[in-house]
Amino acid sequence: MLDLKTFLKSFLTVTVFCGSFCMQAQSPFVSRVFEYYPAPGQFINEAYPAYASGESYEEILNKLRAVLLGRKESGIVCLGSWGGYIVLGFDHAVQNKADTVDLKVYGNAHNNSAEPGIVEVSKDLNGNGLPDDPWYELAGSDYYSDSTIINYVCTYYRPSPPDGDVLWKDNLGDSGYVRRNDAYHSQASYYPLWVEADSMTFAGSRLASKASGGGSSWISPPYAWGYADNWPNNHPGADFDIDWAVDEQGQPVYLDEIHFVRIYTAVQEQLGWLGEVSTEISGIEDLHTEIPDLGTDKASMQYLSSNRQLYVQAPQGSRLEVFNMQGLLVFSDEIEAGTVLNNGIEELVVMQYSLDFLPQNVYLLRLSGSWGSLSTGVR
């Protein structure tokens, strides 16, 4: 048995245990997935994330957690047609610092391929750790444009048969279809199959499309600023300032900090053989939190809550160790990570550990190696 006092002293960074739950060291990246309701689209059910027959909504959320949490540009999540959205959260408050941007939203935009998403933020006013407080849109370049529709509402209907085009109707009296694109995406349905309801209604702002073209040639130019998946990730246009927040009447609102981010697809547009415009997200970063440097001779220690789900990204040969509060090693594993290509960039696979065999308790985690990241299943 390892002496607990010696064990604690052997680490350079230790997180703090508070009350009935445990808090990790602050991550600069989102650490929680609360909601995911994509509108219908050509990638829905097929990928980003893929749907397996019979999967529940919670299982879909777990797939998102495995690819989105704890790092940037980890995996792509598709939000589908206009209104489809995701709600994410940080393990800390993102500070609104004066005269600088505060957040970066990662997507997969490149030259003339913008698929803009509207970004909203919320502060945990009631302190319950849930995104149930008011939301504020970060007003981008086109928020006050006459062509932008505020208070837009659109409903999508489950197709019958399931592989049919998806009908939509809006509050302006217009209607249309999310068209099948079977040459490239021939899954059973474009309507999210884990959603039990036969219709999905979304509300928000709708931008006028900038896309143009026809036949085999289409372009979708970026908006000036203030939208997700609009500019490449290395462009300042992927950055956001909390000072852009406005209320439902379009009046500026000052937020000293935020905890939650909601993003939804901002346009309703079909681009021929390219299919519908659908915002895609691969991560969100707090630009004011430094990424911890584990170093080659250092270790990372965090607490594992009673959820007992763990996500690890580390090079092959790194070792994960789990200790109980008496200092006894209760689980260890050598990381045998492979790699995947994401937009031409080689990335480490995120390994998921389900430690359900451990009694519900508090555990200490250590990841040793040249570098790495740990993300627990606290949701």
Where does each model-flagged region fall?
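Bacterial Sec-dependent N-terminal signal peptides
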Residues: 1-26, 291, 311, 350, ...
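Residue-level detector of flexible, active-site-proximal loop/helix-junction positions
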Residues: 18, 126, 142, 337
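A domain-level signal for the mature, folded cores of soluble proteins
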Residues: 26-115, 134, 139-288
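Short beta-strand/loop motifs in extracellular/secreted proteins, especially
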Residues: 86, 115-117, 316-321
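Predominantly extracellular/luminal cell-surface or secreted proteins
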Residues: 120-124, 323-325
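Acidic, glycine-anchored loop motifs typical of Ca2+
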Residues: 125-134
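Short, threonine-centered small-residue motifs that mark membrane-proximal processing/anchoring sites
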Residues: 288-294
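C-terminal outer-membrane/trafficking sorting elements
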Residues: 294-379
